[in-house]
């Protein structure tokens, strides 16, 4: 089995960080978050990290790291996928449009596929909620208000 951690910008739908590995430990989600922080364009903006109630997000290793990097933590109130709709949508796209629903031969293949999928998703896949723009375009052009989210 392989486990995937994603950090997605809710405004632009851009996958900011990701990590795939054979375990679902706090280090998996922490490394995805580290990648996301490195990829930020707008370091002056506050970050709210929203996740489900998985133990890897609630443990001190992750929560301390996130808070030490100035993030507010938010979790779903119940175990309801509708409370984490952006994450569920991106997971579904990766599974069904990019082939992550099937069993892959090994972790190396999965990592290569994931890197390619994230690149295509961020730079080529247009979203109706982004006025048919790509996540990368929306992330770099935040003056526009899209259908799902607006800047505060």
Give the predicted meaning of each segment.
Residues 67-71, 93-152:
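C-terminal domain-tail junction helix/linker
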Residues 19, 48-51:
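Short catalytic-loop micro-motif centered on adjacent basic/acidic residues
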Residues 51-53, 59-62, 73-95, 108-110, ...:
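RNase H-like two-metal-ion nuclease catalytic core shared by retroviral integrases
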Residues 12-18, 74-76, 100-101:
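Short small-residue beta-strand/loop micro-motif enriched in glycine and branched aliphatics
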Residues 1-16, 22:
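An active-site-proximal beta-strand-loop segment
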Residues 18-42:
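Active-site beta-loop-alpha junctions of metal-dependent nucleic acid enzymes
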Residues 14, 43-47:
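Short, surface-exposed connector motifs at secondary-structure boundaries
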């Amino acid at each position: 089995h392989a486990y995937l951690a994603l950090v997605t910008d809710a405004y632009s739908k851009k996958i900011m960080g990701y990590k795939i590995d054979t375990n679902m430990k706090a280090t998996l989600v922490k490394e995805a978050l580290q990648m996301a922080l490195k990829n930020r364009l707008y370091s002056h903006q506050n970050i709210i990290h929203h996740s489900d109630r998985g133990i890897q997000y609630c443990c001190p290793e992750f929560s301390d790291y996130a808070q030490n990097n100035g993030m507010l933590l938010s979790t779903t109130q119940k175990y309801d996928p509708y409370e984490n709709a952006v994450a569920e949508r991106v997971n579904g796209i990766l599974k069904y449009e990019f082939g992550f629903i099937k069993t892959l031969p090994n972790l190396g293949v999965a990592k290569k596929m994931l890197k390619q999928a994230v690149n295509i998703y961020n730079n080529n896949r247009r979203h109706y909620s982004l006025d048919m723009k790509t996540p990368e375009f929306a992330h770099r052009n935040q003056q526009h208000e899209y259908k799902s989210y607006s800047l505060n």
